Amino acid sequence: MFPLRSRVTTVGRNAAGARALWRATGTKDNEFGKPIVAIVNSYTQFVPGHVHLKNVGDIVAEAVRAAGGVPKEFNTIAVDDGIAMGHGGMLYSLPSREIIADSVEYMVNAHTADAMVCISNCDKITPGMLNAALRLNIPAVFVSGGPMEAGKAVVADGIAHAPTDLITAITASAKDSVNDDQLLSIEQSACPTCGSCSGMFTANSMNCLTEALGLSLPGNGTTLATHTARRELFETAGKLVVDLCQRYYGEEDESVLPRNIATKKAFINAMALDMAMGGSTNTVLHTLAAAQEGEIDFDLSDIDALSHRIPCLSKVAPNGNYHIEDVHRAGGIPAILGELRRRDLLEKGVHTVLYKEMDSWLDDWDIRGGKATDKAIELFHAAPGGVRTTEPFSQSNRWDSLDTDQARGCIHDVDHAYSADGGLVILRGNLAPDGAVVKAAGVDESIWTFSGPARVVESQEEAVSIILDKQVQPGDVVVIRYEGPAGGPGMQEMLHPTSFLKGAGLGKACALITDGRFSGGTSGLSIGHISPEAAHGGLIGLVENGDTITIDIRNRSLNLDVDDAVIEQRRAAMLEREKPWTPTNRNRPVSKALRAYASMATSADKGAVRQLD
C-alpha cells in the first residue's frame, strides 16, 4: 500500500495545525485519512468556454464525496484567445499555459492533494492542466466544459453562411461586400451558447486528444456543453478518480498514473487522431510540451512520421462546413480512432483511465464497429438545442439518426479519405531547418506548390495593416517575423492576418509564413512555427522584400531562394547591429512577466516550453 500524499497534513500529532485549518474549510473528522481530490476548475466570466463551469465543480465534488474521497476545489486562470486576438493581449496567451501548469503544481503540492479532476476547456487551459498532470504524475481525470453549438444560418453578401462560427464573423469583417447590418447579423449568430468555439479549433482539438491519450472519458471532446448528456461525464469523472486513488494508493497499481497512461504510444495515437481529424496546428506545440513534462521521448520527428502514413478522414470548420456537433453525430473520437484501427494505424498496448486496453474501449464506443453498447449509441444521439444560452445541461435534443456514411458523411473511412497524408504536415528547408507546420487539410491542393516574392513585416499588427490597405498582391508570400516564443514574446496567433487575406479574396492567391503560430480557426496556405525563430538567429530574420520563397507541401519543403553567399553577407551585417536578431521598427511594450517568459522560451520545435538549464 502506498501512503496517501495528504497524510502529512491529516494524520498524526504533527498535523494538528493543518487539521485545524482543514476543519475550517468544512472537512469533517471522518474525512481525515481519505484521499483528498483537487477539483481543478477554470471558471471565468471572461470566456464562453468557461462561463458555465461555476457550478460544475460542485457536481464533481458530490461524486467524489459519494465515492469516498474529500473534494477540494480551486480555480486557474483562463485566457480567451478570441478576445485576446489581434492586439497586445495575444502576447499573454501561450505563456498562460505555463502559468496554469505552475499554479496547478503549486496548489496541489502545497496542499498535498492525492489526485485531481481537471475541468478545462479552452485553448491553453487543457494543455496547461495536461502539463501539470504529467509533471505531478498523480491519479488524474480530465473532463472539459464541452463545445459550443454552431451558429444559425445567416445570409450576407449574397452568400448563405450556414452554420456560422467565430471565424465566419472575423472573415466577414474584412469583406467590403458585407455591410454593417449583415456583419452584425453574422456576429450575433456566430457564438450562440456557452462552450468552446464550435469548429475543429485548438480547444476542441485538444479536448479530443485527451480521449486518445486515455486521460478523459469517451465523448469528452465532442458532447455539447449545453446537453444533459454532458452532466454524466462530470459525475463519472468524480467517481472514477476515487477508484483510481484506491487502485494506486490501496493496491499499488501504478498503471493508473498519467505517465503510464499517456505513454509514447498514446501520444502517437493522439497525434494520429489529430492528423485524421484535421486538427489545429497548436496541438503540435502542446503535445511536444506535454511529452517533455512527462519525460516521454516524443518529438517533431514522430509527428512528421505520422503525417506520412495517417490519412485525413474529416474536414471540420474552418476546413469544411461541418462542426464538432457533426463529429459527435458521426460517432465522435471513437469513430475516428475506429477507422484507423481497422487499417492497423494505431499503436497497441495502451489503456485509459476507464479501460485496461484500447480495444475494449473502441469495441464499446465505436458506433461503426458493430459492437457498440447502447450507452454509446445513446450518447452520440445528443444534438444541439438551437437556443441561445450560457447554461450547461440545459437541453436534451436528440438527432433522429446517426451519421454513419463513411464516404460522404462527416467522418470518412480510409478508402474515402480526403487525402492519403495527414491533416498536418511538417516542412523543412533552409527557412526551417528545425521544422515548420502547415495545416494541409485547410489548404486547397491547387496551391500546395507555391512560389512568390516576400512581403516582410515584423509584427502581426503591421501584417494586418498592409493587408487591409491592399498592399498585398496575388502571388505574394507575407512573412511575419519576430513573433516567435521569444521574439514576440509569446508567439501570437495570426488569425486576423489569415482571416483578412481570406476576406480580401486572397485566400488561394497568397501564402503567409511566420515564426509565430496560428489559431485553430486558420485555413489557407499558412505556415507557422518556423524554427529556429528570428529572435534565435533563424533565417527568417534575414529575408528581404522581393526575395523568392518556395513552398512545396507534397515534398515537405520551405526554402528561401537566395544564394548562400548573399545569406552570409546578410548574416554578417545582422551581427554587426547594436541589437542583432531584433525588430528594427517595432514599438511594443513588453512587461516583466513577458520578458521572464521570453528569457527562457524555446522555439516551436521544442513546444515553446521554458528552458531552465
From Swiss-Prot:
Keywords: 2Fe-2S, Amino-acid biosynthesis, Branched-chain amino acid biosynthesis, Iron, Iron-sulfur, Lyase, Magnesium, Metal-binding. Mg(2+) binds at D81, D123, K124, E493. The modification N6-carboxylysine is found at K124. The keyword Ligase does not apply. [2Fe-2S] cluster binds at C122, C197. GO terms for biological process: isoleucine biosynthetic process; L-valine biosynthetic process. The active site is at S519. GO terms for cellular component: cytosol. It catalyses: (2R)-2,3-dihydroxy-3-methylbutanoate = 3-methyl-2-oxobutanoate + H2O; (2R,3R)-2,3-dihydroxy-3-methylpentanoate = (S)-3-methyl-2-oxopentanoate + H2O. Its cofactor is [2Fe-2S] cluster; Mg(2+). GO terms for molecular function: 2 iron, 2 sulfur cluster binding; dihydroxy-acid dehydratase activity; magnesium ion binding. Pathway: Amino-acid biosynthesis; L-isoleucine biosynthesis; L-isoleucine from 2-oxobutanoate: step 3/4; Amino-acid biosynthesis; L-valine biosynthesis; L-valine from pyruvate: step 3/4. PROSITE patterns: ILVD_EDD_1 (PS00886), ILVD_EDD_2 (PS00887). SUPFAM superfamilies: IlvD/EDD N-terminal domain-like, LeuD/IlvD-like. Homodimer. Belongs to the IlvD/Edd family. Functions in the biosynthesis of branched-chain amino acids. Catalyzes the dehydration of (2R,3R)-2,3-dihydroxy-3-methylpentanoate (2,3-dihydroxy-3-methylvalerate) into 2-oxo-3-methylpentanoate (2-oxo-3-methylvalerate) and of (2R)-2,3-dihydroxy-3-methylbutanoate (2,3-dihydroxyisovalerate) into 2-oxo-3-methylbutanoate (2-oxoisovalerate), the penultimate precursor to L-isoleucine and L-valine, respectively. This is Dihydroxy-acid dehydratase. It comes from Corynebacterium diphtheriae (strain ATCC 700971 / NCTC 13129 / Biotype gravis). The lineage of its organism: Bacteria, Bacillati, Actinomycetota, Actinomycetes, Mycobacteriales.
